[in-house]
Amino acid sequence: MLQLNYIRENKEEVLKRLAIKSFKDAETIIDKVIELDNSRRATQKDGDAIKAEANAIAKQIGELMKAGKKEAAEIQKAKTAELKLREKNLDEALKGIEEDIKNLLLQVPNTPSAKVPLGKTPEDNELVFEHGTKPTLAQGSVPHWDLTTKYNLIDFELGVKLTGAGFPVYKGKGARLQRALINYFLDKATEAGYMEVQPPIMVNEDSAYATGQLPDKEGQMYHMTVDDLYLIPTAEVPITNIYRDVILKESDLPIKNCGYTPCFRREAGSYGKDVRGLNRLHQFDKIEIVQITHPDKSYEALEQMKDYVAGILKELELPFRVLKLCGGDMSFASALTYDLEVWSAAQQRWLEVSSVSNFETFQTNRLKCRFKGADGKTQLAHSLNGSALALPRIVASLLENNQTPEGIKIPKVLVPYTGFEIIN
């Protein structure tokens, strides 16, 4: 959530940055926010004046009582009662105005960084670099959904029977490959200085609002209405919320956490070839990395996180590319995002496997996650997160790119985790 003072002091800049994200109602909402804030300030000023007057009268009453002037004191007490009623009404009005401001601010996306490329569609994203050689597959090579059936790795139909489409059942070496990737990704993260946490996979409404999933992605989340809980779309939500309503020491920064969780997304409106097999699921496994940093260090941390994920893809020997997302392709909460995509040899297209983002103070303002500097003053920290990595499309590309007439070869770095070198 954008900070109210920042909006007041930088209205034109805020509108300019929001236009990069193609936020249509920006001017209407921002003008209304400023109008309400003016009302808030006026109401607050009136309330403070009444409190000051009531305090002065209370002092007078004490002096009158000491002087034995009870009748005059009673007159002043009547004034005090009237002032308290006015104060109560102003407090209620103030709460209503503040709630209206909050509800409007919740609709406003984060302002993109000045480093964000201009554009409205994925075609406008900026290519940062591409790594690796796209493999040339032997004749008769097939996409991963055929490979998983051929080698009895994943049963999509059984998942439909048990739950529905988008909930695959991993079996045999398919399940072992899944577990191997999870352990490998977690080991890499802890080696890089991230503390592993195992958070809940359901969160309350406050947590979903704090990281920006609500109200932006309400239709994409599974909502457990009986208990009013949400299945998490990413471990970012519970891990980042560890620091909700927390004041850190500057020496605590940066905080680096990682965690593995199943993730759940409704993916409403997704159809066609792009959702076949592992390309888009309702339940999938992912390792997330999260950092809470000093504002001066967050973009340095973003580059480190992007390079860290790229390093894993290099070890997996997967051709990949890094994109800097344009304003129109960015998420609601992000200030700057890198997407990392791997090459799918059988599908002949790029598959997104990671998004690494800096949210600056957008999440921490909602979280009320602050730190106290050496001067004793508190300020909002910056938050960042990234997928490191999401498993489904990694598995898809590993199976497709490494298929041979003899079977599917396992990357060397994974063999100690899988216990086998080939799937045949």
Question: Could you tell me what each predicted segment is?
Answer:
Residues 130-424:
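TRNA-recognition modules of translation machinery and tRNA-sensing kinases, especially anticodon-binding
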